[in-house]
């Protein structure tokens, strides 16, 4: 269990009486950030809670005291900021507290240990300069901000490497929380040599323990070559000096039989293509960030796996495993179908790939997942595949964008949009550009940070660059009135892309188009784009005459137009 601060000191219990225990955000104490570790009362209450729990549970166990899982500074009060300045890490207040907690725990429960996460570069990943954590405090280094397409020793992860190498100066108990895969769609990528290099690095630095977060999409159903990957991890944790190519050969020979050579060619293609990417891949990677999934690459890999299946067609056991190895590739073809179809000469239809993917996934879930999970897993996939089945060719853009040559325009439809917490929904809409749209009830109440001059019922939308933390806001209904009825283009302004960016909607940011990052080209890093969102509105907040009783907005596409043409 991690991200536990509010388990120990719940704000719903204590904030009313003790707001000073919680983070200062600007000039206001807030209950939804972190704790104020320099507050004496908070330290006393937290220590009491930890000691009480150890006494009630297992005096020899390990107990997590780790920050909540959201970004931002821990606390803006002067004592906390002074610790940050002294120690050179935003996590300094937490580490200062843990340095004091450790001896108190050791005195009463000498076999107990306290763990915390070194997590996020803007929070606790960098180690402190002068604080030395006691021996009963375990630091679990969790590089969530990494480039997931490259090992930690790659130049793109230089900050992570520096932080990891410096941690042994501050602790004798360094563990790693390792992320083998990205979240988001379970697409294929080459990461086997990455993890082998990382485990050799961990051995050299002196890492003493691991937690492998091997629950990203695809692992439980054998997508992403997850069985091979899991086996490699278990072998490399014991002996990171083992030859990873020899391990892959050993596993594939036994697992795929006569199809093993083709599977190894597929793995080699993934490793080479992923390693050649010049852009970062974040932990929640969109389809667009998998830049190597070009039509040529996808079709070449499909030919390899066609040959693999033909080779083992007479052996049900090996054939099942080859089909499972193919699932992520089939998903990539579904998500990239427009580009595949545009390339021409595709020897299969979209529906054929969808059917094969569904059949293989269903069989894998029923044979591998807990029976109590079958219905939920299959229902989720059925819902997502439905949209690829019902989507229609894109309708023409409305004026004035219809006059712009196609090579200067890129469009993004909502089938791969990130829908936070499942609150927004993808729906069929005959009026939408591709027959589907993302629908959501808007947050009509303006938050406290909203510009005061905004009129009521505007829709907040914008662009966010995760690398530079640059935000760009726009407001549908600010300069001209929102209209109900059909879809209409609303401008988001001019922007520059990065390899990790997205377009978002509503004050809650619960609708996010991450695939726009796939437009980024490092050779054209400063290229400017004019951005538009195609939206329709309904409900009494927008028109008293509307027949719709609920307020909703629908986004059917986001359009990028090159500023220089």
Sequence positions of predicted segments:
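Exposed beta-strand face motif in extracellular beta-rich ectodomains
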Residues: 501, 529-531
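Catalytic-core regions of glycoside hydrolase
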Residues: 1-44, 48-245, 295-302, 306-315, ...
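Extracellular carbohydrate recognition and processing domains
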Residues: 460-524
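Catalytic domains of carbohydrate-active enzymes that cleave complex glycans
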Residues: 233-457, 466-475, 488, 551-556, ...
């Amino acid at each position: 269990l991690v991200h536990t601060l509010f388990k120990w000191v719940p704000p719903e219990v204590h904030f009313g009486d003790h707001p000073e225990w919680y983070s200062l955000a600007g000039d206001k104490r807030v209950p939804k950030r972190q704790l104020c570790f320099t507050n004496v009362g908070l330290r006393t209450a937290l220590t009491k809670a930890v000691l009480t729990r150890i006494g009630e549970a297992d005096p020899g166990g390990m107990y997590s005291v780790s920050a909540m899982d959201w970004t931002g500074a821990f606390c803006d009060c002067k004592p906390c900021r002074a610790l940050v300045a002294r120690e050179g890490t935003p996590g300094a207040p937490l580490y200062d507290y843990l340095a004091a907690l450790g001896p108190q725990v050791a005195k009463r429960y000498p076999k107990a240990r306290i763990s915390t996460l070194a997590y996020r570069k803007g929070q606790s990943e960098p180690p402190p300069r002068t604080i030395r954590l006691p021996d009963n405090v375990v630091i679990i280094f969790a590089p969530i901000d990494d480039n997931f397409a490259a090992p930690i020793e790659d130049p793109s992860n230089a900050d992570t490497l520096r932080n990891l190498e410096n941690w042994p100066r501050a602790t004798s108990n360094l563990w790693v929380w390792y992320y083998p895969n990205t979240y988001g769609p379970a697409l294929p990528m080459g990461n086997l040599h990455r993890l082998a290099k990382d485990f050799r690095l961990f051995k050299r630095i002196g890492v003493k323990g691991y937690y492998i977060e091997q629950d990203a999409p695809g692992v439980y159903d054998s997508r992403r070559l997850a069985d091979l990957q899991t086996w490699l991890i278990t072998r490399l944790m014991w002996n990171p000096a083992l030859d990873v190519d020899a391990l892959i050969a050993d596993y594939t020979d036994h697992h795929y039989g006569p199809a093993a050579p083709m599977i190894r060619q597929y793995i080699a293609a993934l490793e080479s293509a992923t390693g050649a990417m010049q852009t970062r891949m974040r932990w929640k990677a969109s389809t667009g960030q998998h830049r190597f999934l070009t039509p040529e690459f996808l079709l070449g890999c499909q030919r390899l796996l066609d040959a693999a299946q033909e080779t083992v067609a007479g052996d049900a056991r090996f054939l099942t495993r080859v089909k499972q190895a193919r699932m992520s590739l089939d998903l990539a073809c579904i998500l990239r179908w427009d580009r595949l179809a545009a390339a021409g000469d595709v020897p299969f239809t979209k529906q054929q790939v969808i059917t094969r993917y569904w059949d293989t996934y269903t069989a894998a879930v029923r044979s591998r997942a807990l029976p109590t999970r079958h219905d939920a897993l299959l229902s989720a996939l059925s819902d997502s595949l439905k949209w690829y089945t019902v989507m229609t060719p894109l309708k023409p853009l409305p004026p004035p964008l219809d006059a712009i040559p196609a090579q200067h325009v890129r469009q993004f439809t909502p089938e791969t949009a990130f829908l936070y917490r499942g609150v927004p929904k993808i729906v069929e809409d005959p009026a939408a550009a591709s027959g589907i749209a993302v629908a959501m009830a808007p947050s009509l109440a303006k938050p406290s940070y909203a510009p005061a001059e905004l009129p009521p019922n505007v829709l907040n939308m914008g662009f966010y660059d995760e690398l530079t933390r640059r935000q760009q806001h726009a407001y549908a209904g600010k300069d001209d009135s929102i209209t109900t009825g059909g879809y209409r283009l609303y401008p988001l302004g001019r922007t520059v892309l990065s390899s990790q960016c997205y377009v978002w909607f509503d004050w809650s940011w619960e609708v996010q188009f991450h695939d726009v990052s796939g437009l980024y080209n490092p050779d054209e890093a400063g290229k400017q784009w004019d951005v538009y969102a195609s939206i329709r509105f309904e409900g009494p907040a927008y028109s008293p005459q509307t027949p719709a009783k609920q307020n909703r907005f629908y986004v059917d596409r986001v359009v990028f137009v090159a500023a220089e043409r």
